[in-house]
Amino acid sequence: RFYAWHDGRNGCFLGISKVISEKVKLNGVKLFEGLLLGGEQIYETPVKENEKDRQDLTLDVPWYQVGSGTKTYMVGMFKEETSRDIKNEDLPTLIWRNGMYRGSIFAVVGDYLKDSTASGILDGMLTEASEYSIYPIVNAQNLSMVNFPGFADENNEELMELYSQSVTGVGRDVIWPTLISIVEHSDLKMTCFIQPQADYKDGIEPDSEFLEFYLKQFKEQSAEAGLSMEYKSADSLEEKVDRDGEFFANADSDYRYGAAFAEERDLTDVLNLSEIKLLKNVSTLICEYTEKHPVVSYASDSITLQSVVGDGMHYTYSADLRMRSIQSALGYTNIMLNLQDIFWPQNEKDRWEIMERRFASNLLTYWNKFNCFTATTLSESDRRVRTFLNVDYTESREENVITLNTTKADSWFILRTHGEKIEDIEGGSQTKIEKDAYLIHAEDHTVKIQVDEPGLSYDSRHQ
């Protein structure tokens, strides 16, 4: 958390012209376009009581006003009746830059540089302080359906009471058609992490006929089947993996499972079981979002880890800011919907009609600005993650030609400029993301990007 003070010397250094108050209560914040991808965004505390839990940003802050030579990226907002008497430029400044003779000073008020939220903000600062920036990204957009489908009619009494159908019936006739519709509207691809059964002690076994049905459905929908390592009741994770292995072997299916979901606390145990036949083809793991691991990394020498970026059900403003930041830094997301509570409800809100409505709303509202990036399954994303983690590159510029040299052909980069547009590209292709931001596909080891002749060179000190 950053707190600055104004004593003449430090005020000039940070660009602060006046300290109005050591602490004020905000009603929200406004992020201006340019620092992160995705455009301008307002995070105002919702009026509706059932939506107020979305607001989880830091709202108790000092009120700084900045002077000339600064550029503001985020400001605090008051309630409408208070804001009427305050000019926009006088609102509390939360993220800004002060141009100095030999560079720039960036200041952040609040905890916006915590966890992975820092990644895109720091890349944005680098861009703002430079004539241009170009950096490698993953370019993968993932949608993970965890603990779906299931093939055992467990907890039937409760499911029959709620839906008049069994677990397998609810999955096939209620949930699956809705998921198809949501995915078609979002232009994303699904990876469904199968949970053959949840309770390994109740004597109810999974039915392999449903496996055959879903594998055909996945193929039609360009979806992928993965393995879920979660369970409700078993003597151990190893027992669960052994029992699942027997089920898949008896189903006489030759499907190769390349992705598996595990809770963060179980990752080490899953890695220790990776030589078991069921898991031998798994090349990537996913887990819920955690600050203990990078967004994408190696879990072992041969297996990657792709963290979930957002929970499709419980969406907050800090989660949205983190998602935008990760998209800006990596061109990557992994949205999770865990369906275990549908089949094993904990409260009255664990109903599919409630979950489906909220999930669809969140997905189509918050992620739709990033459809310039590629929709992938987790195994497709895995290949791009490996390229990203292993790529080395250099870049240089001579007049209006930027030269990118990369050790990995078929790699992806983001180019960010200040008003310059791409006129031509050799050795690759480009897609405009938004104003001053381009997705670069390096198809060869050397890419030459010609931008239009700038009228004036960019000077970060005076923008």
Tell what function each PLM region has.
Residues 2-27, 149-152, 180, 184-274, ...:
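Metal-dependent polysaccharide deacetylase catalytic core of the NodB/CE4 family, i.e.
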Residues 8-10, 39-40, 56-140, 332:
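A glycine-centered loop/beta-turn motif at secondary-structure junctions
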Residues 110-111, 132-133, 139-141, 145-149, ...:
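Catalytic grooves of carbohydrate-active enzymes
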Residues 111-217:
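Active-site beta->alpha N-cap acidic-glycine motif
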Residues 119, 231-252, 301-327:
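Alpha-helical scaffold elements lining the catalytic groove of polysaccharide deacetylases
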Residues 277-314:
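His/Asp/Glu-enriched short active-site or ligand-binding loop at hydrolase and phosphoryl-transfer sites
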Residues 375-419:
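Surface beta-strand/loop "capping" patches
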Residues 435-463:
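C-terminal beta-strand-rich structural cap/linker in extracellular carbohydrate-active enzymes
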